[in-house]
């Protein structure tokens, strides 16, 4: 199989070692470390019964042909390299990414899809992460980090599918096909900036706005919302901007018993600097097609497995190490155990880590104003990232992953003077939500108090009171509600807090959770440590729950409510206890 041969069948073939092509017309770019990590992630999963004796691994390569970039190399055991899995992978990726190649490992090649080249790999190369050997065997590639770029265009598209009893699978597939065939009729409007993405759309001066917006943009934070419209005519070439466009999807009913499946798809597609109107239209149409196909495949899988017809929720992710977004339809009404098993399958399919969650709904990106959120969208997220002009004294270790800033006077509760530990607890809980360890909402003060009553630590009259809690109570509630273990650091003075800086640094390196510290009748949240081994100088990144103002990031960072504090911040005359919540190591 030469680099130019295409394949459209599924299976494995034994291949003789290939010599590299004599000439190289175009170089592709690939991040070999990302490829090696994907292989390691797959191998980290324990094998299923069906793969217990299966050692053959292959893979598929997805990329951007126009840019000659390999974006993903997905590895899989032979049994998982199926046409349906290939279609599911493609339907979940950004609409500008397509199948570009296959993988040959130790002389055995994946024969699936229409790849234009084959990566020549060996088990030893992958296990040793040997970039030099890869480049020697694959001369059309340059090893380079591929940067994330571009803005995200996002729109909500609703569609209803009527499914006849006993023929649900057939009707789901037909409905998805009809929606894909009609996708050319959809247009996307942003009224604020007078932007229209549609078929037969001529270039206008408004394109300059898109170039300005997309230059230097990042897809997970730079977003333009569009309203989806559907043309009522088949030929859209002569439509004016305001003609024959309505936000509707036609539904055909018959006289038989049917199930009505309603889906609100979050259609997301990238926009890059220099894009033409036609570039955007092609990606928008492909993104809608992929949402329909992804919904169809998840629905059919649910029917085949005996779960019946289930609704799905659109979710967009930026998994760790990825430079493009992942788009999924998640089953809404499955049991928690069913959802967990499904997430494990997705982790294997997309070569995500086996030791930590990546695809919980709480980890999805709220790109649209109506995206699903499991935390209060008004709260400030990761305020420490907005601290500017800080010069480290030594080595900085800090919290890993997002969290929300909880402080006095939020949620309509006046807890000034007594609620600081409750707020620190809520900040810690938000970390566990946003990093995918739970979908349970942040507990209120009353919820926290009731949990302490339930375990026998407090009497019933404690519920609804304005009584303080401390580090011990926080650990009790985390264990009761989330089954989490906590470590403690107890000190007799503020000076001892400084002496435990190395221990705190190890916590942030390994666990990464915010740390609640209580002492001197106050509670704070430690987000990081700056420690100089040579001089002993130590500073602490503190999030102060005693703030009573509005969600103003400038005030919070400039007035010291989220700031680096010197060792003298801790009182020499008081003891302090720290709670270090431990994330589970087997949670997906």
UniProtKB/Swiss-Prot annotation:
It is found in: Endoplasmic reticulum membrane; Cytoplasm; Cytoplasm, Perinuclear region. GO terms for biological process: positive regulation of chemotaxis; protein localization to non-motile cilium; proteolysis; response to ethanol. The active site is at residues 420, 544, 546. Keywords: Cytoplasm, Endoplasmic reticulum, Hydrolase, Membrane, Protease, Thiol protease, Ubl conjugation pathway. The keyword Cytoplasm applies. Thiol protease which recognizes and hydrolyzes the peptide bond at the C-terminal Gly of ufm-1, a ubiquitin-like modifier protein bound to a number of target proteins. Required, with oct-4, for the localization of a subset of 7 transmembrane domain odorant receptors, including odr-10, to the cilia of olfactory neurons AWA and AWC. Operates in aggregation behavior, and responses to oxygen levels. This is Ufm1-specific protease. The gene is odr-8.
């Amino acid at each position: 199989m030469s680099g130019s041969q295409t394949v459209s069948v599924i299976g494995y073939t034994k291949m003789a070692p290939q010599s590299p092509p004599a000439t190289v017309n175009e170089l592709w770019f690939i991040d070999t470390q990302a490829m090696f990590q994907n292989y390691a992630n797959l191998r980290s999963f324990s094998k299923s019964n069906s793969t217990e004796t299966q050692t053959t691994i292959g893979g598929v390569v997805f990329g951007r042909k126009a840019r000659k970039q390999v974006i993903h190399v997905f590895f899989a055991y032979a049994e998982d390299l199926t046409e349906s899995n290939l279609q599911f992978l493609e339907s979940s990726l950004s609409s500008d990414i397509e199948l570009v190649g296959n993988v040959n490992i130790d002389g055995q090649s994946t024969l699936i899809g229409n790849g234009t080249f084959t990566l020549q790999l060996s088990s030893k190369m992958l296990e040793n992460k040997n970039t030099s050997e890869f480049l020697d065997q694959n001369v059309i590639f340059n090893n380079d980090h591929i940067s994330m770029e571009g803005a995200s265009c996002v729109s909500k598209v609703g569609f209803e599918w009527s499914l006849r009893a006993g023929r649900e699978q057939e009707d789901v597939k037909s409905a998805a096909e009809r929606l894909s065939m009609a996708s050319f009729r959809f247009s996307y409007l942003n009224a604020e900036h007078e932007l229209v993405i549609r078929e037969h759309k001529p270039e206008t001066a408004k394109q300059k706005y898109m170039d300005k917006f997309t230059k230097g943009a990042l897809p997970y934070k730079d977003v333009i919302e569009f309203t989806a419209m559907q043309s009522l005519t088949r030929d859209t070439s002569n439509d004016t901007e305001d003609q024959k466009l309505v936000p509707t999807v036609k539904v055909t009913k018959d006289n038989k018993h049917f199930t009505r499946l309603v889906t609100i798809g979050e259609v997301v597609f990238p926009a890059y600097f220099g894009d033409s109107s036609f570039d955007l239209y092609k990606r928008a149409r492909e993104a809608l097609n992929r949402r329909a196909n992804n919904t169809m495949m998840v629905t059919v899988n649910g029917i085949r497995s005996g779960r019946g017809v289930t609704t799905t929720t659109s979710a967009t992710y930026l998994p760790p190490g990825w430079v493009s977004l992942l788009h999924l339809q998640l089953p809404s009404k499955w049991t928690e155990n069913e959802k967990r098993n499904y997430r494990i399958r997705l982790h294997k399919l997309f070569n995500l880590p086996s030791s930590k969650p990546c695809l919980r709904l709480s980890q999805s990106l709220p790109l649209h104003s109506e995206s699903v959120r499991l935390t209060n969208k008004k709260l400030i997220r990761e305020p420490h990232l907005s601290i500017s002009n800080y010069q480290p004294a030594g080595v900085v270790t800090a919290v890993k992953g997002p969290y929300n800033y909880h402080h006095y006077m939020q949620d309509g509760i006046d807890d000034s003077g007594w609620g600081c530990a409750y707020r620190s607890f809520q900040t810690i809980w938000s970390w566990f939500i946003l990093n995918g360890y739970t979908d349970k909402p942040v507990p209120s003060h009353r919820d926290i108090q009731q949990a302490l009553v339930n375990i026998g630590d407090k009497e019933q009259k404690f519920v609804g009171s304005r009584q303080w809690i401390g580090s011990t109570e926080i650990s009790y509630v985390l264990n009761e509600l989330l089954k989490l273990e906590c470590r403690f650091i107890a000190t007799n003075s503020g000076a001892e807090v400084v002496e435990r800086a190395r221990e705190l640094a190890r916590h942030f390196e390994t666990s990464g959770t915010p740390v609640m510290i209580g002492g001197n009748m106050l509670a704070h949240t430690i987000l990081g440590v700056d420690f100089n081994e040579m001089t002993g100088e130590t500073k602490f990144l503190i999030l102060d729950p005693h703030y009573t103002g509005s969600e103003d990031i400038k005030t919070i960072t400039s007035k010291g409510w989220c700031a680096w504090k010197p060792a003298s911040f801790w009182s020499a005359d008081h003891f302090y206890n720290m709670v270090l919540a431990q994330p589970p190591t087997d949670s997906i």
